């Protein structure tokens, strides 16, 4: 069972698609670097929708898998 996505991953999922459409030949490592920089520059208020979605996913995950324990 996978862990639920955090706020960065929720936002990155959307942005990654946009970047891949604009630059289909860009390597995944470069896309990840750009996403990290964009996230760091994003204001706290702009992150709120992603934080809320991540929280919703976390709560759903807890309901779906009540005995889940993260084991790396």
Swiss-Prot record:
SUPFAM superfamilies: HMG-box. It is found in: Nucleus. Residues 1-69 bind DNA. GO terms for molecular function: DNA-binding transcription activator activity, RNA polymerase II-specific; RNA polymerase II cis-regulatory region sequence-specific DNA binding. PROSITE patterns: HMG_BOX_2 (PS50118). GO terms for biological process: brain development; camera-type eye morphogenesis; negative regulation of transcription by RNA polymerase II; neuron differentiation. Its main location: nucleus. GO terms for cellular component: nucleus. Keywords: DNA-binding, Nucleus. The keyword Repeat does not apply. Gene3D superfamilies: High mobility group box domain (1.10.30.10). PANTHER family: SOX TRANSCRIPTION FACTOR (PTHR10270), TRANSCRIPTION FACTOR SOX-4 (PTHR10270:SF27). This is SRY-related protein AES2. The lineage of its organism: Eukaryota, Metazoa, Chordata, Craniata, Vertebrata.
